[in-house]
């Protein structure tokens, strides 16, 4: 007789004996070095205490938001003013439809690993799981930093705006808390010249570095100044959210001409953006 494994078990995703040995005997207890995420440096540095699982899961997870929107959930329950329990119930309605999507696996792995809950999240189990998670979160032992330490996370590299002061990274380093909290340089906003807030971003950067930015070369130098600042705070990575890899070559003079158009708030063509 064939024994059917439950959805989550100690051999989850381990389909061969070799896989089981490699994971359990070698990989399982190794520290995690998370070199890309969208976690909040402030929440980690301050070890934010969460009152509800909705605050952990639904307050800023655009993957969950997209799944809920795809299912037709009203925005009121996604980023709107609905209360946290209502939002969680709507997420519970969505979860069964994410089968074969990583969201389904992530949801149940997190319930099992962080909260010791093996039950599948469905509309029927939603209120019960909501209460169980909240009780554990409100114990004072599952703050933002605690959750990472419990999973043996050794290093966290957050995604950071070049304008960021990195004060929370510095506070974490000074206080000596685990995990190591390092910044990642994400300069997208200074390359997206077609965005309506582009000029205001340039103005903020100019103020921060204490130099006027009126030419393309000035922008390059200003960003280099911020790279140096980030480097001094432990940054060794950059992150670029490019929709595609651009291949149009351009001279420094042409780049400066496009930049001047942006500063004058004139429209730019698709070719100029690329």
Language-model features: where?
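Metal-cofactor-binding active-site regions of metalloenzymes
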Residues: 2-274
